[in-house]
């Protein structure tokens, strides 16, 4: 089974339990918090992702470190993932769970990259256009990347809209090469 499919199955199982218990938002917040701490802690990564560390020790560490912050459902789910030796799928599971939660709430996550910081007016206008385009509420994360030279790169879920000057120059270069060859 491919990596994405494994993560999707585990995420769907956790989502079903969270939905049945009316705890989708809480479970999502717990997963986001757990993953944020996991991303920030090299020590925790080295323990959880190391196949030489016994599963029981991993579970004990998770219970000790997160037992007070996580609900029983989320904590038990993480222990199940560890029991099944699926810890390498944790990020994918969290991402799939968040996507399922967003789909339920008619929300789409977007990432907008610009060469310069966008003004508040530009951000509001962009949000309105993207919301009309998708028919969904948006959660947009903005980032600045001077390498794109100008324009925007917008990621909406699985779709990427590359309106950057860098991409336009690449297309022009490819077009010139094809003309010379042909």
Swiss-Prot record:
Transmembrane segments: none annotated. It is found in: Cell membrane. It is a peripheral membrane protein. GO terms for molecular function: proton-transporting ATP synthase activity, rotational mechanism. Keywords: ATP synthesis, Cell membrane, CF(1), Hydrogen ion transport, Ion transport, Membrane, Transport. The keyword Cell membrane applies. Gene3D superfamilies: N-terminal domain of the delta subunit of the F1F0-ATP synthase. F(1)F(0) ATP synthase produces ATP from ADP in the presence of a proton or sodium gradient. F-type ATPases consist of two structural domains, F(1) containing the extramembraneous catalytic core and F(0) containing the membrane proton channel, linked together by a central stalk and a peripheral stalk. During catalysis, ATP synthesis in the catalytic domain of F(1) is coupled via a rotary mechanism of the central stalk subunits to proton translocation. Belongs to the ATPase delta chain family. This is ATP synthase subunit delta. It comes from Desulforudis audaxviator (strain MP104C). The lineage of its organism: Bacteria, Bacillati, Bacillota, Clostridia, Thermoanaerobacterales.
């Amino acid at each position: 089974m491919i990596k994405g499919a494994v993560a999707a199955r585990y995420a769907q199982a956790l989502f079903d339990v969270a939905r049945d218990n009316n705890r989708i938002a809480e479970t999502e917040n717990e997963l986001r918090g757990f993953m944020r701490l996991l991303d920030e802690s090299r020590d925790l990564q080295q323990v959880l992702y190391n196949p030489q560390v016994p599963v029981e020790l991993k579970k004990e560490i998770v219970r000790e470190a997160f037992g007070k912050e996580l609900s029983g459902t989320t904590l038990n789910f993480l222990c199940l993932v560890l029991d099944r030796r699926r810890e390498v799928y944790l990020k994918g599971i969290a991402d799939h769970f968040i996507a399922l939660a967003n789909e339920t709430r008619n929300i789409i996550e977007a990432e907008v990259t610009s060469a310069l910081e966008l003004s508040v007016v530009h951000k509001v206008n962009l949000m309105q256009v993207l919301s009309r385009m998708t028919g969904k509420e948006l959660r947009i994360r903005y980032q600045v990347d001077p390498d794109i030279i100008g324009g925007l790169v917008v990621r909406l879920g699985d779709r990427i809209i590359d309106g950057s000057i860098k991409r336009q120059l690449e297309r022009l270069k490819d077009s010139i090469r094809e003309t010379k060859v042909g």
